[in-house]
Amino acid sequence: MNKQNARHRRGLKAKALIRKTGRSRLVVYRSGVHIYSQIVKSDQLGDKVLVASSTIDKELRSSLTGKSKVEQASLVGQLLGKRAKAAGITQVAFDRAGYKYHGRVKALAEGAREAGLDF
């Protein structure tokens, strides 16, 4: 089993546990260059994206130049939190998709908490 498969398996286990809580999930995807986050509501018909933000958002693009990836992730989390508050979402479950809670993933979570999300 390689690293990606192991991360995927960890993520599936976590997703199954989070779905039982009934809360919306704050899902993180981390690529080599960008970081993406979505708040997803799960139900029997499937998943629905309620709010999203990433480093390729037009709102953030100009303010990200010259910043490290960790700083960029924090700004993405803050933008996601701001959009979630505007949509009436205050409580979520953090689905880190098998990634370690460290670096960019941690910075995104802390940025979202600063913006008022509770998880």
Curated annotation (Swiss-Prot):
Q: Which GO terms describe its molecular function?
A: 5S rRNA binding; structural constituent of ribosome
The UniProt keywords, alphabetically, are: Ribonucleoprotein, Ribosomal protein, RNA-binding, rRNA-binding
- Look up keyword rRNA-binding and say if it applies: yes
- Which SUPFAM superfamilies has this protein been placed in? Translational machinery components
Statement: the UniProt record of this protein carries the keyword Kinase: no
- In Gene Ontology terms, what is a biological process of this protein? translation
Q: What InterPro entries does UniProt report for this protein, alphabetically?
A: Ribosomal_uL18_bac-type, Ribosomal_uL18_bac/euk
Entries under Pfam families matching the protein: Ribosomal_L18p (PF00861)
A Gene Ontology cellular component where this protein is annotated is: cytosolic large ribosomal subunit
Function according to Swiss-Prot or TrEMBL:
This is one of the proteins that bind and probably mediate the attachment of the 5S RNA into the large ribosomal subunit, where it forms part of the central protuberance.
Which protein family is named in the record? Belongs to the universal ribosomal protein uL18 family.
Instruction: Cite the record's note on assembly.
Output: Part of the 50S ribosomal subunit; part of the 5S rRNA/L5/L18/L25 subcomplex. Contacts the 5S and 23S rRNAs.
What is the recorded name of this protein?
Large ribosomal subunit protein uL18
Identify the species of origin.
Legionella pneumophila subsp. pneumophila (strain Philadelphia 1 / ATCC 33152 / DSM 7513)
Lineage of the organism: Bacteria, Pseudomonadati, Pseudomonadota, Gammaproteobacteria, Legionellales
**What is the name of the gene encoding this protein?**
rplR
